[in-house]
């Protein structure tokens, strides 16, 4: 656990010293997904994230990082970045080779997939907590705590054997310790400061209503869409008047391509109960001016067609009568 210097706390948290004062991400992690098809073929994908925002990719062909933002390097120099790329490049190649060499000993049947996540997060009081977890086929397998490999209960005896093997590589464990407890915290602080303008920026949400697939006879699925907001925390609810409507279902908050967020709130109601319902959106960027959209039954396509065709027919009829009268007057001697 690492404590932030007081000066940096003041920069990141001008309104207080808790993580809630920073309106943006508070953790960084890298994700590794290694797929093993057989004893000679493996593929690894990697990415780096600030909470749910991806800021790095990994080019497997060149063995280099892809920086998705101008400030994705944080305050690291080009030399430091190159050294880290070399560490990850050697690790990825060595990891695949070691897994394939020991797959038979650990009774791992092809094909299989190994997932890993490692990083550090900012907690209340200015503490930074580092973590590393590994999974096999989507199930917890092991973790690293205090520079020691800890097998997960779900991993059984296989995880215990793998941890015993890993702990024999003390040189590698020392590199892991340095990356987790020194490099990651320093990078996290630097990238949060470098990307502060983007990460703490506020974008007002846009909201609109639609109807979803009918849940059943005589029922409606009301959908309230909210998009384009930043930061991520948002409150959306269907309401009859000033009370929250029971049964409102919130989907996952999903990222947009421009680093804003999208959320939809749905409500299954009887068709006769939809009138008078509204969708209310609260967000810090609105400064108390909530968005309120009232539900009204959408105009049917048939009504739209009638609204266009009937006036057109009347116009044509009037033109025809005018033309016939004009012709009749011209025929009078």
Curated annotation (Swiss-Prot):
Glycosylation sites: 38, 75, 146, 258
Classification via SUPFAM superfamilies: Immunoglobulin, MHC antigen-recognition domain
Transmembrane segments: 304-324
PROSITE patterns: IG_LIKE
Annotated keywords: Adaptive immunity, Cell membrane, Disulfide bond, Endosome, Glycoprotein, Immunity, Immunoglobulin domain, Lysosome, Membrane, Signal, Transmembrane, Transmembrane helix
The UniProt record lists the keyword Cell membrane: yes
GO cellular component terms attached to this protein's record: endosome membrane; external side of plasma membrane; extracellular space; lysosomal membrane
SMART domains reported for this sequence: IGc1
Signal peptide: 1-18
Major subcellular location class: membrane
Disulphide bonds in the chain: 120-184, 149-163, 224-279
Tissue: Expressed in lymphocytes, spleen, lung, liver, kidney and heart.
Intervals, Cytoplasmic compartment: 325-333
Membrane topology classification: Single-pass type I membrane protein
GO BP annotations, alphabetical order: adaptive immune response; antigen processing and presentation, endogenous lipid antigen via MHC class Ib; antigen processing and presentation, exogenous lipid antigen via MHC class Ib; positive regulation of T cell mediated cytotoxicity
Protein location: Cell membrane; Endosome membrane; Lysosome membrane
GO MF annotations, alphabetized: endogenous lipid antigen binding; exogenous lipid antigen binding; lipopeptide binding
Extracellular side: 19-303
Record's function text: Antigen-presenting protein that binds self and non-self lipid and glycolipid antigens and presents them to T-cell receptors on natural killer T-cells.
Oligomeric form and interacting partners: Heterodimer with B2M (beta-2-microglobulin). Interacts with saposin C.
Miscellaneous: During protein synthesis and maturation, CD1 family members bind endogenous lipids that are replaced by lipid or glycolipid antigens when the proteins are internalized and pass through endosomes or lysosomes, before trafficking back to the cell surface. Interaction with saposin C is required for the loading of bacterial lipid antigens onto CD1B in the lysosome.
Name of the protein in its database record: T-cell surface glycoprotein CD1b
Organism: Aotus nancymaae (Ma's night monkey)
């Amino acid at each position: 656990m690492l404590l932030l210097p007081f000066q940096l706390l003041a920069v990141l948290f001008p309104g207080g010293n808790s993580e809630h004062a920073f309106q943006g991400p508070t953790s960084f992690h890298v994700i590794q997904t290694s797929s093993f098809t057989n004893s000679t073929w493996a593929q690894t994908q990697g990415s780096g994230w600030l909470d749910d925002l991806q800021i790095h990719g990994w080019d497997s062909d060149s063995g280099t990082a892809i920086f998705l933002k101008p400030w994705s390097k944080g305050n690291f120099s080009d030399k430091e970045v190159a050294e880290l790329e070399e560490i990850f490049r050697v690790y990825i190649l060595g990891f695949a080779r070691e897994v394939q060499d020991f797959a038979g000993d650990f009774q791992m049947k092809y094909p299989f997939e190994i997932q890993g996540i490692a990083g550090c997060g900012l907690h209340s009081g200015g503490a930074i907590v580092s973590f590393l977890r590994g999974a096999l086929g989507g199930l917890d397998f092991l973790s690293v705590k205090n520079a020691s490999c800890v097998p997960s209960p779900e991993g059984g005896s296989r995880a215990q054997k793998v941890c015993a093997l890993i702990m024999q590589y003390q040189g590698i464990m020392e590199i892991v310790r340095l990356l987790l407890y020194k490099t990651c915290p320093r990078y996290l602080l630097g990238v949060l400061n470098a990307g502060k303008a983007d990460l703490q920026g506020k974008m007002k949400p846009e909201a609109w209503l639609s109807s979803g697939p009918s849940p059943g006879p005589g029922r409606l699925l009301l959908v309230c869409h909210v998009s384009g907001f930043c930061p991520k925390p948002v409150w959306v609810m269907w309401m009859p008047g000033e009370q929250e409507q029971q049964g409102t279902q919130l989907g996952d908050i999903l990222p947009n391509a421009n680093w804003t967020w999208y959320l939809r709130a749905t409500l299954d109601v009887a068709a006769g109960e939809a009138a008078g319902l509204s969708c209310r959106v609260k967000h810090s960027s609105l400064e108390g001016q909530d968005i309120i959209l009232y539900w009204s039954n959408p105009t049917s396509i048939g009504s739209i067609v009638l609204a266009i065709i009937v006036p057109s027919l009347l116009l044509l009829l009037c033109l025809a009568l005018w033309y016939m009268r004009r012709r009749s007057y011209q025929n009078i001697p």
